[in-house]
C-alpha cells in the first residue's frame, strides 16, 4: 500500500476492463438497495454487505460473528467479512455489461477523441452508437469501404447481394472492433508524412489527430478502453441512503442512475438468453447505452434524466463540477474543527497582538487542552471526569483555561478574505460577554467595522502551527501591506482626529509664549488651565529627551505646542522631534527655525510666525513607515499602540462633533448659479440657431455646471473656518472630503441617470437647504445605481481574484539566483506629461542588472546585482538618470517560479524575499484586493456624477484576459515616417513609409489620430488614440514590448484610482500569461507543430536534438488570457479544480498525464503540505548534524515582550 501522505506524483489514465474488475469486491446483480422491513442491505444489491463490507463495525450481516475478536473472518452463512464499517467508503463493486457501451466523455467531448482516433465525424459515431446506422467493420472483397455507414435498407440490400463476405455492425460493439483494429504506429507515421505537404483545414485536422494518437501511443492506454465492458460501482458510503424522520428515505441520485443501468442490463441479458428478435435487443442495447451516459454525465446528450419534480439527477460528472463539486467544496475548502464565530466589537484597550475571546467560546475551543491540564494538575481523576467538569462549568475550570490560553495564539479571519491580511494571529485574553474584541488598528487590514460584522476564530493545534502563527502571522508582525510595502495599520477615524486635534496650533491661545523648563512643567500648566494644548510655548531643548538635537541646540529653547510635546513622547528617543508635517523633519531632524536663543523675546517671535499645519492621516502614515524603517517591528507596534491611545483620548477630550450650525450656506451661491444659467441659455440659443451640434450643446452644458460646482466648492473651502468640525474631519483624513461638504453646504451638482448618462439638469440645492421633489427623484437614480453596481462588481472582482490566484499559484521563490544575463529597462511611467509612477517607486527594493553611473561625474551609483534601497533610489532619481536596467520576474530563468534576485525585496517585510515565499498568490491577492476597492468606490458618493470605475475593473479584466480592447488603436507594423494622411470616402487612411515598403492603414470611423505627416514612428506604436490589442503588439514586436505595455496599462488603471501596487506583482502575473510558445515548425524534434508548449519544455526539446546535430524546432511566443493560461497549466488537478472539469480530466486521462505536484493547489487537493514556506522540501528534509549547547545571543529588545 502506498503511503497516503507521501508520494511523488499523481497519474491518471483510462481503466481497462481487467483493471476495473481488479478494483471490485464483487458484482452487483440486483437493483435493490435495502429491505424496507429489516432496513438491512439486500444481497447482491447496490448496498450489499458481502461486496462492500459490513454496516456496523465488526459485525456480519446475519449476526453470527460480533466483536473485534473475529477480525478478518468471513462468515460462512452470509459471506460478509468481519471488519470496520469504514471500508464501505473504499470498496468498489462492478456491473458486467451484457453489451459494450461507449464512454460519453470520449465520444461527446469537444473535440470528440473517439472521432479523432477513428477519423470519423462525431455525427457518424452517434448514428452508429445509438443504433441508427450500420458501420462496415470488415469490407472483405466487396466495393464497400471500412468505416462506411449503411442505413438499415442499404445494409439489407448489400447482405442480399454479397452474403456474408463483408461484416457490418451497430452500437458500441462495432466501434470497439474498429478501435481494436487500429495500428497506432502506422497511423502516426502516415499522419507525419501528410503533415509535410498538407495545408489549411487538412493540416489542422491532421495535427489534432496526431496529438490524440501520440497520446495513446505514449501513455499505454488502449483506444478500445474508451468502450466499457464493465462498469465500476462506487462505494456505497459515497452515495449514501439515509432514513428521514417519518420513515421515508433520502438517497443520492447516483443510486437511481445505477438502478436504471442494472435494470436495463438484466433485461438485456434475459432477452439475449431468450433469443429475442434483433430489433428488440437493439432497442434494449440503446437504452442501456443511454442509461450509462446518464450515470457518467447526465444531460450531456439529449434531455437529462429527471427525478421527482422534474429535477435533473446529479451524475458522476456533476459531483466534480462547479463550486459545489468535489474539488471546490471538499478538497479545496474543508470545514475545520476547533473553530467558532461571533460578532466583533472594538477593544480599544488591547495591545497590538491581543484579541478578546469570549469565555464560553474559549472553553469550547480549548476543551481538550483544558481536560489534559485538569488531569495533570490532579483536579480530575481521568479524562472522562475532566470532561464532565467542563460541561458543568465548575469554577476551577476557569483558572485552568487562563493558564492554557497563555502563549497559545488563535487565528482570526473575516470573510471575504481578499488578501493574506484577512487572517491574522492574536494572543487571546478572556472577556465577559459573547462578542470577540478586535484591536482597532487591524480593522483596515480586515476591512472590518463594528456594525455587526462577524469573525471566525481558529485554534492552531500542533506546536509547529503555533510557532508559525506566532512568528509569521501575529498582528504585530503584519505592519506593512504586501501590495505596496506601505503600513497598513495606520490609525483611522477617531484616532486620526484625536492626533490632529492634539497637534493643532492656535494663534493667541491662552498662555502663548510661556517658557517651561521641561515637558512635565508644561503638562502641569495645561492640567491647571494656564495653557491650552494648542498654545505655542517654548521648552528647554535639553529637557526634551531627544538624541537628534545637537549640543548647540540643547542649550537653546525649542518652540512647540503642549500638544506636540505630548505627541512626541510616543516616539522612540532617537527619532527626530516632529514639529512640522514635512519629510525633512521626519527623515533628518527638527528644522533649525524652531530653536531660539535663551533670553530672546519668545512672544514676539511666536506672534510673527504662521501657524504650523497639524498632522493629518497621511503624515501619521509616514511617521509609522519611518519608525518601521529604522526600528523594525517591536518598537513600531509599541508606538502604534501609544498613538492609538493618544488618538482616542484626545478625540474624546476635543469633543469634536457635527451640528447643523457647522454647515454654513455660501452667500455668493445664487450669483454663481445665475451666471451659469445665463451661459447655459446662451449655449441653447446657439444650438437653436444651428451653430453647434446636439453633442456640443450637451457637452458644454455639462461643463458649465461642473465648473459652477467647482467654483462653489473652491469658495466654500476658502470661506471655511479652520476650526470648523467638518473641515477638521475632512482635512485630517478622519472622515469625509470636500465633495461631501460641497453637497451639504453648496450644491449637489450633476447626477447620472440609470444608464450612466449625465442628466444636464443639475441639483442646485444643497442638503442643508433641502432638495425639491424633482431634485430628490433625480438623486435616487444615482444612489440606486451605486448600490446595484457594488453588489454586481463585488462578484466580478472576486472572480477576477480567483482567476489570478489560479494562474499564479505555482509561482514560488525557488532559488537564490537564476543567473540570467537579461534585465528590464525601466523609467517613470507617464501619461502625457503626468507622471503615473515615478522612477523612485519602480526602483526601490529591486536588484540592478547593470551598473548605474552618474550621467555627469561617471561615479558608480549602483553596482551590478546590488539591492536598490530607498536612499540609493533617491540618489539615482536626483542624478538625472532616466532609465535603469533592473532584474525582473519577466527575465527570470527559474522554472516553476522566480529567484530571489529577480524578485527583489519582499514588500510585506521590507527585507529580502525568502526562498519558499509564495509570491504568485501574493501577487494575485495584491491585484485582486484593490479590485474590490475600486468596485466599492462608486458606492460612497451616493451616485454623484464623476469618473465611475467603468475604466477600472472591466479594463483590468480586459488586460488580464488579453481580449481585444474596446476602442482599439491602430498600430504601425513597420518603422518609418508618416508619409501622408488621406481622406477616403467617409474615413481616413494613414500611409507609413518604411525603408523598404510603405503600408497603408485604414482608420476606423470616429477614431482620433495621434500622428501628423512627417512624424517618425516605430513599429508597435499607435497611430490613433485608444488601447492597443496586446496580441497584435506581440505579432509586430517582441515579448519585451508586450510585457512593458501590459505592466504600464495595469499600473495606469490602478494609479488613476489612487491605488498603489508594486510592479513586481503585475510582473509575476504577466509572466504567467507569456510562458507558452506555439510550435510553428517541428524540425527534427518530437514536438508536434501547432502545439502549445511551456518555454522550458521547448528549449529542452531543442537542446536534446542540437546535441545530436539535428534540426531544432521553431516557435513563436503566445499571449494567453489568465483563464486560458490556468487551463493550460501542466497540473491537471489544478486545472480541473478551476473550470471545465470534465474537459480537463478527459484530456489528462487520454494522455496519461502525470501531475508532479509542484503548485500549491495540487498539494492542497491531495492533502499534502503546500510546497511553499516551511512546507518546502529544503526545509522539511533537515538532518541533525550535531547537538551543542550554547548561550542564546538574543538581545532583549528583539523579543516582543510587554509586561
Curated annotation (Swiss-Prot):
EC number: 2.7.7.6
Pfam families hit by this protein: RNA_pol_Rpb1_1 (PF04997), RNA_pol_Rpb1_2 (PF00623), RNA_pol_Rpb1_3 (PF04983), RNA_pol_Rpb1_4 (PF05000), RNA_pol_Rpb1_5 (PF04998)
Binding positions (Mg(2+)): 449, 451, 453
S-S bonds: none
Residues where Zn(2+) 1 binds: 60, 62, 75, 78
Keyword presence, GTP-binding: no
UniProt cofactor(s): Mg(2+); Zn(2+)
Protein name, per record: DNA-directed RNA polymerase subunit beta'
Annotated GO MF terms: DNA binding; DNA-directed RNA polymerase activity; magnesium ion binding; zinc ion binding
Cofactor stoichiometry and binding remark: Binds 1 Mg(2+) ion per subunit. Binds 2 Zn(2+) ions per subunit.
